[in-house]
Amino acid sequence: MSNRLYTTRRQSIVDALVTKFKDINGTGDFLSNVYGNVSPRLKFWDEVEDFPAIHLNAGSETRDYQGGGYKDRFLSVTIRIYVREEDAVDALDKLLEDVESVVEDNSRLQYTDRQGNVQYTQQITILSIDTDEGVLEPLGVGEILLEVRY
């Protein structure tokens, strides 16, 4: 079998992001504490039992073929964030800020592929941030769309 340089690394990247988001613990510069409620699978708000919670999902993946057999891979990742607070808008804004900070601090994210090799993303870009704007209060739902280049 040949060395698989260009295999998909979807789940490995999502798992590495989950590990980083679990560091949001209300200490230091963090404004929120997720108490480890971070999952590599999306849930809808009516399925979430523990708040606050962060759920991730790997979406579509594309390739950009370069010269010399090199290709860039682009993975879309959806991050859905749930809070239940008296002031859900404020709690959601704080947690969104924490998630954004983790993404920005880890744009060159280290992860391990299926063969056990340490890899790095080239760049993680936030494409959009959206919220329910308080419509579901005391629940709050936010969504961040990422593009991961690896």
For each of these PLM feature ranges, what is it?
Residues W45, N57-G59, L127-D132, R149:
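A structural detector for beta-sheet-dominated domains
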Residues P52-H55, V77, I124, I144:
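A broad, low-specificity signal marking well-ordered, structured residues that form hydrophobic/aromatic
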Residues I126-L145:
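Glycine-rich, aromatic-bearing surface loops/beta-hairpins
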Residues Y70-E86, L139-Y150:
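Oligomerization/assembly interface segments of phage tail-like spikes and tubes
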Residues S12, A16, K94, D98, ...:
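Residues forming well-ordered secondary-structure scaffolds
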Residues M1-G67, N106-Q122, L136:
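Small/polar-rich, solvent-exposed N-terminal microdomains that initiate assembly or binding
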Residues G67-F74, V83-N106:
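Extracellular/virion structural assembly segments
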